[in-house]
Amino acid sequence: MTQTNFRSGPDVNGLFGSFGGRYVAETLMPLVLDLNREYEAAKADPEFAKEMAYFQRDYVGRPNPLYFAERLTEFCDGAKIYFKREELNHTGAHKINNCIGQVLLAKRMGKKRLIAETGAGMHGVATATVAARFGLPCVIYMGATDIERQQANVFRMKLLGAEIVPVTSGTGTLKDAMNEALRDWVTNVDDTFYLIGTVAGPHPYPAMVRDFQAIIGKETKEQMQEKEGRLPDSLIACVGGGSNAMGLFHPFLDDASVEIIGVEAGGHGVDTDKHAASLNGGVPGVLHGNRTYLLQDGDGQITDPHSISAGLDYPGIGPEHAFLHEVKRVEYVSITDDEALDAFHQCCLLEGIIPALETAHALAEAMKRATNLRDDHLMVVCLSGRGDKDMQTVMNHMAAAEKTQEKLV
């Protein structure tokens, strides 16, 4: 890891090393180029920054706390663990940070309709929320499989006025929802703004979503200085597409003393075909407008991911994560469904916080590591979302485990 400036990407072509870029249909190219121009202009406009700051503070509820997880720290008997409390945001996750930024950009561009894809439903809820706030019609593409396991969020989106389009192609999950959203965008290029929910897609989306999420890491830096007088020693976040992780990581990338760990969904184990760990079990390829690591078979076809967590159930990862993996600035590991469920329960019992199953993957890795670290090691875990949406999934798994136990007895 000889490079010292890890925050300079992407280049003018949207590349982070060999990853990223703009792999889109000819009809979309003028649109993404226009979006890039508008975003660059918005970044340079103090009025845009002022409006962003207003909504982040008074609508989203930022800054959210950096919380010392005292009982979890005692339980692990090692590192001092802090939670960055993104689940306290309006709508219950980090997704709203990005949605506020993109809806303000859509408004600036004069777009009259929003579309989005969603997996766990949190990005769908956040998009429906900002659509309601700004009086824009909104269509959410969601895989039929995810609709089944995220009924509460589907109802929330409908309450907020969104139209939900079930996607039955493929496995009916996030990848398929994104495919359908891209088709909609091609058809309705003039009036529609595609509000992508993660650090993927064609340039400028990976950089734009990262920039809107970087408030997570910026606040963490300031809050840790206030609380401990120094930088944290390690950062841990779950990674699907990777927006909460990139939001936490990016402001720290050039701080060599800070160890950074991204946690992928290991499903039933990365040695099986039932996981969603693109970096630990995938190879480079092109999907959804960018080159990144993807789960593929021997013929280069995208394979079906698996995770107990709908938000991590994606066969790719943001291109900047792929770059950071290759240059070894960030370590990417995987956590299985069972490990995530164990951490989910521990967090509930020890801290009185019900985390999202996505977040539970990061918590599981944090607990593994904390036990072997000194008590002056400062660790920050991104609590990316709350677990209300996952109650049915957890109930089903607990019921299945009880049945298995009964059979054994």
Swiss-Prot record:
Xref: InterPro entries: Trp_synth_b_CS (IPR006653), Trp_synth_beta (IPR006654), Trp_synth_beta/beta-like (IPR023026), TrpB-like_PALP (IPR001926), TrpB-like_PALP_sf (IPR036052)
Keyword Transmembrane helix found: no
EC id: 4.2.1.20
TM ranges: none
GO molecular function, one term: tryptophan synthase activity
UniProt cross-references to PROSITE patterns, sorted A to Z: TRP_SYNTHASE_BETA
Alphabetical UniProt keywords: Amino-acid biosynthesis, Aromatic amino acid biosynthesis, Lyase, Pyridoxal phosphate, Tryptophan biosynthesis
Cofactor(s) it depends on: pyridoxal 5'-phosphate
Catalytic activity field: (1S,2R)-1-C-(indol-3-yl)glycerol 3-phosphate + L-serine = D-glyceraldehyde 3-phosphate + L-tryptophan + H2O
Metabolic or biological pathway, per its Swiss-Prot or TrEMBL entry: Amino-acid biosynthesis; L-tryptophan biosynthesis; L-tryptophan from chorismate: step 5/5
Classification via Gene3D superfamilies: 3.40.50.1100
Disulfide linkage: none
Modified residues (N6-(pyridoxal phosphate)lysine): K95
GO cellular component: cytoplasm
Quaternary state and interactors: Tetramer of two alpha and two beta chains.
Protein family according to the UniProt entry: Belongs to the TrpB family.
Protein purpose: The beta subunit is responsible for the synthesis of L-tryptophan from indole and L-serine.
Protein name, as recorded: Tryptophan synthase beta chain
Protein source organism: Pseudomonas savastanoi pv. phaseolicola
Gene encoding the protein: trpB
